Amino acid sequence: MVTHALRVGNTFGLAVFRAGAGYALRMAPRRIVSLVPSLTEALFAFGVGERVVGRTRYCTQPPRCVGGVEKVGGTKKVDVGRVLDLEPDLVVAVREENARESVEALRAAGVPIFLGAPETVADALEMLEKLAGIVEAPRAEAVIGPIERVYEGLRRARPVRRPRTFVPIWKGPYMGVGSDTYVHDVIEVSGGENVCGAHTRYPIVSPEEIEAFQPEVVLLPDEPYPFSAEDLAEFYALDIPAAHGDRIHLVDGKLLTWYGPRMAGSLRQLSALLRLP
């Protein structure tokens, strides 16, 4: 019997690996449906991609591998009936990305759920370790080891001064990231100081408030809002150190929000962008 401790907390009232009692599977799952793009990529990196029988339409990585995997809708609007048709013995979900109603419906149908709720890089690492254990991943160390080494290196580095950093995740209105989000911790671990850190969740901020924050670095991700070169002028027009010092950067949103095999490279790239001259 495979018995890896997932924990039961108040997140959706479902099995959550990070806060409560036990959860067990009789054997390693053979038919996995992943509702989380970054964890779909992780499952393939772990060496169990052949067991992934379902994915969302946003699960596009690795592109050469996922093409033949059945789609079950989006991350927020999962086709529960289609998932059940695939007869999974494990569904992989994350609180931040998947709708409570979909996860509850699958649980009510008797489907084992792995539900992660990472709010920090350390949480994400623990989640990956638990998932790797449950699926008996043959390449777990090859994926997780490099992330742990980069993470510990950044924790020990302790920059002399952390640049004030603004990361909008939406426009119209602008929305930043609060202290209880995964992106906040990614910024902090990478050496920045999140200017919206006094807030929670995703605070709405005006251009005037952005100027008051006086960010020294602005990172414009291409997801969830697709910031592009057309948005740069609006930020360079602000009276902020990031504009004066030419430190407004368009970045791949996956650097900030994806868990899994790309985390080591993401943390390295972000720490380089947040290193002031």
Where do the PLM segments sit?
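N-terminal ligand-binding lobe of clamshell/alpha-beta domains
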Residues: 12-277
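Short terminal hydrophobic/aromatic SLiMs and anchors at protein ends
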Residues: 2-3, 10
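Short linear motifs in low-complexity or flexible loops
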Residues: 3-5, 15
